[in-house]
Amino acid sequence: MAGNAYSDEVLGVTNWLKDKSSQEVFSFVFKNENVQLNGKDIGWNSYRKELQDDELKSLQRGAETTWDQSEDMEWESAVDDMTKKQVFIFDSLVKKCLFEVLSTKNIAPSNVTWFVQHEWGKDPGWHCHVLIGGKDFSQPQGKWWRRQLNVYWSRWLVTACNVQLTPAERIKLREIAEDSEWVTLLTYKHKHTKKDYTKCVLFGNMIAYYFLSKKKICTSPPRDGGYFLSSDSGWKTNFLKEGERHLVSKLYTDEMKPETVETTVTTAQEAKRGRIQTREEVSIKTTLKELVHKRVTSPEDWMMMQPDSYIEMMAQPGGENLLKNTLEICTLTLARTKTAFDLILEKAETSKLANFSMASTRTCRIFAEHGWNYIKVCHAICCVLNRQGGKRNTVLFHGPASTGKSIIAQAIAQAVGNVGCYNAANVNFPFNDCTNKNLIWVEEAGNFGQQVNQFKAICSGQTIRIDQKGKGSKQIEPTPVIMTTNENITVVRIGCEERPEHTQPIRDRMLNIHLTRTLPGDFGLVDKHEWPLICAWLVKNGYQSTMACYCAKWGKVPDWSEDWAEPKLDTPINSLGSMRSPSLTPRSTPLSQNYALTPLASDLADLALEPWSTPNTPVAGTAASQNTGEAGSTACQGAQRSPTWSEIEADLRACFSQEQLESDFNEELTLD
């Protein structure tokens, strides 16, 4: 920039201050006051006693060198030798105090950044500014540093005092110095607590903007304010002359000035608030954002996913209540901003959608075993989970045991995460766990009894208030319900009396999914990634989770007597006991099914003429089609399921026509 216009010393100091521009340091002021003890006056220049400590002598010689090197040769300084000597002694005493405190903290001076400047003011007279900081310094340590420096400063002042004092007067002088706080720390007063807290300053900014811009004192006694000498840990400002100091200040100011001025708009609410957030508030808000982002809804999830923040809050006073309230805010945020369908959908791994087959999922295999259109059933469930079912806000899985009700409901609840459970054992507060949730799970529901009206309100998605144990009432917002049962919940009994007036209202609030086929023992559980992929597949293929889309796809809103088998699917589904791909399933043929018979001669005519059928099995085809050799083979070829009685009959008629049976039987008789 200006390598040819400025000296290397000026540019070196400027770059050094820029490197330290963001370092926070303590700001101390050393001073003394005029004291009178038993008629003896002790002023600011009464501390010129010759020092016997070798380290103090070395520090004093360093101050003398700094003064000589920073003198401007264009004019001669008018400061007398007595004033100079007093400043040199003060400089050595201040640095001695700093080094002694560093020694007590086991901090190496090389790891510390400091700056010292002696000044004269109209009101305080002589005083010394000290900036000190480093990686081992923190804001709460500021007051401890002030107390320690005050003790060392008072002790060394008494040692350097050249006024003849008795031992008692020396002790009194030290008490005055300590009680009057001749070492002060820069602090600020909190608006609400009214307490003083340490205020750190930026090292580079404070030196360039404040200290280097001052004028040097050249008269004795000093008439105006200014500085005597300054030094620092990097030996950068020690030997700068007054003009060079002003030039460094100007260069630093020009380079650190922002190019554009950012304007901020403060709303009336923010201006009215006018408060400073505490560190605890900022920490809680940061933790809360992380919990919501990671969908943490229980203390166990918090312990596993964010153990550091959990331990930090637990260690604070009232930590248990703080954890509970923070988690409640997190679940409330999820319940108000997301639906159960949203929470399931965001867990889908889109990379698996390309090879995903909805027909191969355990959920769809259960539905297909009942002959249902599994896409239609899943679409209806997703509409309810997305709060689009209107008054029909509950998915009811009912039927005999071991038909897959609970494993489907469990997979959905696990995918949602933020789930509340109905507790039938808690007669007075059964919905205690159902507030601020995205889904309510009612497992093995029974007779509603006295709670039927509450159940109807929650199952229809109404906003109601419930009582909680040890608390006041709390509001439950519209929340989808998933319910499993082996009983007929539409029959309400209060005492020994049935209430049929509740049957139809309960049916109007339910998405009826009646499972009747028992699963084999090796069927297994529904995978946790299954429902997220099902939801993503539906969205990808145009089955949006809205009732308008459902009606456009399937014709009408689902009701209690909904026929899930219509419209039929063309895609075959494997049986429940098989985990193989449909392409690997062997075709059903007469030879593979081992339907060979050896009829008697008297029964040949009956076998060929009378249809083999049961009261529940329709007769297969006409006589013309039954007597052809192709009818039986086509009845089972290409099918991916077990043959019906009609297909078996067609196969037998194809293999054992009357003429063929008589011919085979006659051949056997001839051989015998």
Swiss-Prot record:
Active site: 210
Biological process per Gene Ontology, one example term: symbiont-mediated perturbation of host apoptosis
EC identifiers of the protein: 3.1.21.-, 3.6.4.12
Key word Metal-binding present: yes
Post-translational modification: Phosphorylated.
Residue ranges of the region described as DNA-binding: 1-276
Positions of the SF3 helicase domain: 373-528
EC top class, as a word: hydrolase
Binding positions (a divalent metal cation): 119, 127, 129
Cofactor binding description: The endonuclease active site can probably bind other divalent cations.
Region described as Disordered: spans on this chain: 615-643
Keyword vocabulary terms for this entry: ATP-binding, Covalent protein-DNA linkage, DNA replication, DNA-binding, Endonuclease, G1/S host cell cycle checkpoint dysregulation by virus, Helicase, Host G2/M cell cycle arrest by virus, Host nucleus, Host-virus interaction, Hydrolase, Magnesium, Metal-binding, Modulation of host cell apoptosis by virus, Modulation of host cell cycle by virus, Nuclease, Nucleotide-binding, Transcription, Transcription regulation, Viral DNA replication, Viral genome packaging, Viral release from host cell
Motif (RCR-2): 127-129
Major subcellular site: host cell
GO molecular function, one term: ATP hydrolysis activity
Cofactor(s) the record lists: Mg(2+)
Location of the motif RCR-3: 210-214
Residues binding ATP, per UniProt: 399-406
Recorded domain comment: In the N-terminus, the endonuclease region is involved in binding to the origin of replication. In the middle, there are the ATPase and helicase activities. The C-terminus probably contains a transactivation domain.
Protein name: Initiator protein NS1
Source organism of this protein record: Hamster parvovirus H1
Phylogenetic classification of the source organism: Viruses, Monodnaviria, Shotokuvirae, Cossaviricota, Quintoviricetes
